[in-house]
Amino acid sequence: MKKTQYNNLVSSYARVLFHVSGSRLGIIREEVEFLLAFFKDQRDVFVYLSHPMISFAHKKEVMLSINEHLSENLVKFIMVIFANKRSSLLILILEKFLSLARENENEFEITIKSAETLKESDIKIITESLSFLGKIIKVSNVVDPSILGGFVVRYGFNLIDASLKSYLDRLVDLSKMEILKVRNFV
């Protein structure tokens, strides 16, 4: 299966859980956060659940053992994922669901890519300038020397590119267009 097919599949399942959650979105969100933390702490449990040779019945037993922390709707949803042999995608689906829930609550995470590590004051200026979008719940600073200077901010599916590299790339493109114009008119 291609990466875009995986992404579409993950998004489809996440959207279904989001819509099924309805008025219980906050509760389901907390349960999903608990489950993701559990799988992070107990990695071997997720490896077991995502293994294709483990039967549906065994996977169901494991999920029912942690059922006291999860609502019936979430357990049923996870059982559908297992029944459809998509258990290896469970974490991605749950993370995508959280992304949809945050978007619904007007919360988002941002990643700031810069040529060198930004100072807290610089990060604060950037986050304050983006506060009109909603509540920023997490900021990460990724260092990428290839952007030469400035920064690139990614939030959700959006990108703000204020890097020196992109500026120079645009300048090169404009120069090429001008050269072509001159050649065509001379």
Curated annotation (Swiss-Prot):
Keywords: ATP synthesis, Cell inner membrane, Cell membrane, CF(1), Hydrogen ion transport, Ion transport, Membrane, Transport. The keyword Lipid metabolism does not apply. It is a peripheral membrane protein. One of its GO terms (molecular function) is proton-transporting ATP synthase activity, rotational mechanism. The keyword Transport applies. Belongs to the ATPase delta chain family. F(1)F(0) ATP synthase produces ATP from ADP in the presence of a proton or sodium gradient. F-type ATPases consist of two structural domains, F(1) containing the extramembraneous catalytic core and F(0) containing the membrane proton channel, linked together by a central stalk and a peripheral stalk. During catalysis, ATP synthesis in the catalytic domain of F(1) is coupled via a rotary mechanism of the central stalk subunits to proton translocation. F-type ATPases have 2 components, F(1) - the catalytic core - and F(0) - the membrane proton channel. F(1) has five subunits: alpha(3), beta(3), gamma(1), delta(1), epsilon(1). F(0) has three main subunits: a(1), b(2) and c(10-14). The alpha and beta chains form an alternating ring which encloses part of the gamma chain. F(1) is attached to F(0) by a central stalk formed by the gamma and epsilon chains, while a peripheral stalk is formed by the delta and b chains. This is ATP synthase subunit delta. The gene is atpH.
